[in-house]
Amino acid sequence: SSAASDVYKRQVPSNLDYDMWLGPAPYKPYNKHRVHATFRGYWDYDGGGLTDMGQHYMDPVQYLLGKDDTSPVKIEVDAPQQHPDAVGIWRKIVYTYDDGCQIVLEGEGYESKGKVPYIEGPLGKVYQGFECTIPDVMEKIAEMPDPEPQNTDFLACVRNREPFALDELKGHRSSTLVNLGACALRLN
């Protein structure tokens, strides 16, 4: 038999309840790459780095753009055809809102023409590493109050029955955004 077919002939470790691990995902024979950290590379469980960490990057972008209460009307991808089981690379995903605002995500394999801003707006540009063209930005940030740590803020909101700043609807919007991107990749 070939090495490729042997990859699915692995014994499930005795300390792993593989059926519980799979949960509602479709059954696939055990393979060490389908569990632990590498499960993120399979569509059955995740959508790669985009859906694994994407919402954490999209939350502040949506907030800064005032898009917490809306969704894009168009999603375009620049990517090779995705494998049916394994998450592949993508070069770019462009989310366009009804007002023309765009969020552009650059992925692996994207070759930008020069330095591309992380956030760009009418007051300036913010680049990776917080390099910024906004005049006096550090002074403006220093004037802002320090936010409560999220876990402290969350517990206080539960105790006082107040809305949490990062509520479930904002989380839903950011999660939906990256999942729509993953769907667009698969339909590409």
Question: What is each stretch, according to the model?
Answer:
Residues C157-N188:
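C-terminal helix-rich "cap/oligomerization" subdomain common to oxidoreductases
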Residues G41-G47, I75-V77, P135-K140, R159-L166:
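Glycine- and acidic
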Residues Q11, G47-T51, K140-M144, E168:
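Hydrophobic alpha-helical scaffolding
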Residues S1-Y8:
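Short, small-residue-biased leader/transition segments that mark boundaries at the very start
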Residues K9-Y18:
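A catalytic-pocket lid/entrance helix-loop region that shapes and gates access to the active site
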Residues D19-D99, R173:
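Rossmann-like dinucleotide-binding domain that binds NAD(P)(H)
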Residues H83-V87, V94-P149:
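NAD(P)-dinucleotide binding in Rossmann-like oxidoreductases
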